[in-house]
Structure formats: C-alpha cells, structure tokens
C-alpha cells in the first residue's frame, strides 16, 4: 500500500526535472540555404549564361528534319547518338559520347536566324535547340497545320495537336460574337469590349421619327382646337345679337359662302380630332382657314362702326343671294368628322391688279366719309339664316371688297379644302332702297 505513495513523490520530481531540461527548437531546419544552393538554377528565357557557347544556325540547318545523315544509306537522324547506334548496324565504327566527372560540359545557346528578331542578339539567345526551332516556326515560319473545327492555323505541330484536343470542348463567347478558347484572352477582350460599350452609350440616341411627328401633330391640333373654340364663342355672340327685336332667326341651317351647311358641322368641329395623320392635317388646314377669316372679321370690326345696322327684307335677301351664287366663287369644304362632300361651283374673280384695288379702296373710303347715308360695300363673308322658304332678317358685315387684294384674302388660283372669303367685284354700285316701313336697308347688290 506504501508503494504508490513512495513512487508518486519520486516520479513527479523526476518528470518535472526532465521537462525543464528539454529546450524547444525554434528552427526545425537550421540550414535551409545549403539545400537550396545545391539545386540548379534555371535561367530565364532570353537570359543565357555568359559563359555559354553561342551557336548561330542558318534557317535551313535549323529547320531541317534530319541533321545527321548516314553515309551508307543516307538515312537522317535528329540526334548524333541515334546516328552512332545506326552505324553499329552497318558494322561501322561507332562511338557514343560519354561524360566523365573530369570533363567540363560547356553549355550551348542558340540565336534566331532572323536579324530583325530580338532573339538574334546573343544576350537574348535561347537555351535549347528545340526552343529555337519552335520560336522560329511560330514567329517567322509558315503555318502549315489548320484546325478542322475553327479553321485556326498553327506553325508548330505540337501546338496544333494540343489545340485539337480542347477545341470545341470549352469556349468563351463575348457579347460581340467573338469566341475564345482561353479564359485569360476572353477576360482581356471583355474588358475592352465593355469599355467600348460604355463609351458608345454616352452618345444621345435620336428619338423615333413617328413618335416625334405624332407629338408635334398633337400640339398643332390642340392649338387649332383652342382657336376653333374661340371662334365658336364669337359665332354664338353674333347669334345672340341676331336675337334682338326686329330680327327673326332660325339656326337650323346656316348659309356660308353660298353653301347651306347644317349647324352640326360646326358642332362636330369642336370634338376631339382623330389620331390619324390625314385627318389631323386636314383639320389643321381647316382651322387655319377659320383663323384667317376670324382675323379679317376682327380687323373689319375695328375699322367699320356701321356693320350689322339694318335688316334686309325678304325680296332683297333672295335677290342678293342669287347674285352672290351667280357671280361669286364657291369653294368646297369637307367636314372632318362628317363625311359630307359639298359641290364645288367654279367661278372667276375679276382680274384686277393689287395697285388698282388699293386705289379703288381709297376712293370708296372717301365716298363713305363724305356721305353719311352711303352704306359700306358687301363683305365677302356672309352668314345668312334660312328656315325653309320664310324670309329672315340678317346682320351682315358691309365693307368694300375692293379694298382687299385677292392674295391678302387668301383667294388665289388654287382651290383650298376649307371655306374661303368670297369677294364679288362685279356688283354695281347703287343707292340702298327703302323698305316698306320706311327704314333704309343695306343693298347686297352694291
């Protein structure tokens, strides 16, 4: 029973003393440089040993297949050792080169036969014969071997065989369509391709032509609709003035420039325009014509204070309309939303020069200022209101039509697709007749 107790105090101090005498080894390999120095250092390509023998071969000697030829059978061999073994078969003296420890083998280096090549310099010579052969073939030789899959050519057979094994198994395709078999080449090309794409993305792209034309067309149509709504309000104002006592109005039909147009034509004109290009362009022409007429009406209101003064009797109005239809020029107009076609009656406007018309306008202006009882000439734009065959009174704007030239009124040799102002130059000048109730009325035949 005392043995464990005696053994324990004896064994524990001895274990402690043993651990104290053991010193750790910080460097398990105390002499690593000695083993590395014993290894042979490989020279870098193009950095030969200064003590090496430099050999310069001609292109023919370098690229020849069999440099060593047997003098008996003219068989060629790549190495001299192979030739010596072949000579033994002919019972010729042969000798293999044997190396001894006493002999110092001098290292050989080869330069490229191409004078413009960087490896033609002895300081950049290549260290082995096989390496200089492949270099000359790759850089300066003919590419004889072609891949059947990708049609890529190689000058060295070993390169062609290595490529044939991996061709088509793994490829890297760029977004531009270029194929790469090597990942590093693909990454380099992809970086350049992405930079080119970012540079091209900075340029501002041209908007599509159809969308641009549609937007511009919509702006013009909306602007025309605003002008048309303004004219519609003025037309309503004129109609309200016609509702005064002494005027009997009926808005079922409106005679415009000698043409009887239903009132729904003007109502439909204020509706939203269609999206088609042809309807929109037609609407623009129609609105432009109406805007020019409205401008002429406003200008005439500023210069004439006696417009819409007297009513016209039934006989006078019927007689006036007959003269207008027989002498005036009638133009056709097509409603945009209603496909109603109106007949076009040809007419001729008296051929007068612009100077003559202006002189005539000055003369007529002096007559109006001198005589308070004289009435203005009939203005081209007439707004007559009819109800079947009943006589109606109308307010008409009277101004000398000879005071405006044909070009100014927009009445030319060509016909328009919208109603134009009609000017009658052939009506004789006469004094206004008196009505049955004694009130002077405007004679439309003036």
Swiss-Prot record:
A zinc finger (CCHC-type) spans 172-195. Keywords: Activator, DNA-binding, Metal-binding, Nucleus, Phosphoprotein, Repeat, Transcription, Transcription regulation, Zinc, Zinc-finger. Zn(2+) 1 binds at residues 147, 150, 163, 167. GO terms for molecular function: DNA-binding transcription factor activity; sequence-specific DNA binding; zinc ion binding. Residues 20-53, 425-446 are annotated as: Disordered. Binds to RGA and SCL3 competitively in the nucleus. This is Zinc finger protein BALDIBIS. The gene is BIB.
């Amino acid at each position: 029973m005392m043995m464990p107790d005696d053994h324990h105090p004896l064994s524990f101090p001895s274990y402690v003393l043993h651990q104290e005498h053991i010193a750790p080894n910080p460097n398990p390999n105390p002499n690593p440089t000695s083993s590395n120095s014993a290894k042979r250092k490989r020279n870098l390509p193009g950095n030969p040993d200064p003590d090496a023998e430099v050999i310069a071969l001609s292109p023919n000697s370098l690229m020849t297949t069999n440099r060593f030829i047997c003098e008996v059978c003219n068989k060629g061999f790549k190495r001299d050792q192979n030739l010596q073994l072949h000579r033994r078969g002919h019972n010729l003296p042969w000798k293999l080169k044997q190396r001894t420890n006493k002999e110092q083998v001098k290292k050989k280096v080869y330069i490229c036969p191409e004078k413009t090549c960087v490896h033609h310099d002895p300081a950049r010579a290549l260290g082995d014969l096989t390496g200089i052969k492949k270099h000359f073939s790759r850089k300066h030789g003919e590419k004889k071997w072609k891949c059947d899959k990708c049609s890529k050519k190689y000058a060295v057979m070993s390169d062609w065989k290595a490529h044939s094994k991996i061709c088509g198994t793994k490829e890297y395709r760029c977004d531009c369509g270029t194929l790469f078999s090597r990942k590093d080449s693909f990454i380099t090309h992809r970086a350049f391709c992405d930079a080119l794409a970012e540079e091209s993305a900075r340029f501002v792209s041209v908007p599509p032509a159809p969308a641009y034309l549609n937007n511009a067309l919509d702006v013009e149509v909306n602007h025309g609709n605003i002008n048309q709504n303004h004219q519609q309000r003025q037309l309503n104002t004129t109609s309200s003035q016609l509702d005064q006592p002494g005027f009997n109005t009926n808005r079922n039909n409106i005679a415009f420039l000698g043409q009887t147009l239903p009132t729904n034509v003007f109502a439909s004109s204020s509706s939203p325009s269609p999206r088609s290009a042809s309807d929109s362009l037609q609407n623009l022409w129609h609105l432009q014509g109406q805007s020019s007429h409205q401008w002429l009406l406003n200008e005439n209101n500023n210069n004439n204070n006696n417009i819409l003064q007297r009513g016209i009797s039934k006989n006078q109005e019927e007689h006036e309309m007959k003269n207008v239809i027989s002498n005036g020029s009638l133009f056709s107009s097509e409603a945009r939303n209603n496909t109603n076609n109106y007949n076009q009656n040809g007419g001729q406007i008296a051929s007068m020069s612009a100077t003559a018309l202006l002189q005539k306008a000055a003369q007529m202006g002096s007559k109006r200022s001198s005589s308070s009882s004289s009435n203005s000439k009939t203005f081209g734009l007439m707004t007559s209101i009819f109800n079947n065959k009943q006589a109606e009174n109308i307010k008409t704007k009277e101004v000398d039509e000879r005071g405006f030239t044909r070009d100014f009124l927009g009445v030319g040799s060509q016909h328009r697709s919208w109603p134009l102002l009609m000017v009658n130059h052939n009506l004789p000048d006469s004094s206004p007749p008196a009505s049955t109730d004694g009130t002077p009325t405007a004679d439309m035949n003036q």
